[in-house]
Amino acid sequence: MKKILLSLVVFYQRFISPLTPPTCRFYPTCSQYTREAIEYHGALKGLYLGVRRILKCHPLHKGGFDPVPLKKDKNSKTTHHH
């Protein structure tokens, strides 16, 4: 599932995104964010985070820097995302 989702995002980045004007209001872009979220958090949570991000990407949202959230360990402390 993870590989399929990542393949779809990469396909979009390579073949569809270059045909459209840049409109993403965030850094990293929504497609890159989704790709990183899937790689880091796995298919389900990564897809959820990606869809949630895409829904925020509209003219009424200011956008800006919005990295993939870090995982939390069992003690609720964040771990580092590299």
UniProtKB/Swiss-Prot annotation:
Residues spanning the signal sequence: none
InterPro entries in UniProt: Membr_insert_effic_factor_YidD
Subcellular location: Cell membrane
Pfam family, one: YidD
The keyword Oxidoreductase belongs to this UniProt entry's keyword annotation: no
Renumbered residue ranges of the record's region Disordered: 63-82
Protein keywords: Cell membrane, Membrane
Keyword Repressor: no
Entry superkingdom: Bacteria
GO cellular component, one term: plasma membrane
Membrane topology qualifier: Peripheral membrane protein
Family in the record: Belongs to the UPF0161 family.
Role this protein plays: Could be involved in insertion of integral membrane proteins into the membrane.
Protein name: Putative membrane protein insertion efficiency factor
Species the sequence originates in: Staphylococcus epidermidis (strain ATCC 35984 / DSM 28319 / BCRC 17069 / CCUG 31568 / BM 3577 / RP62A)
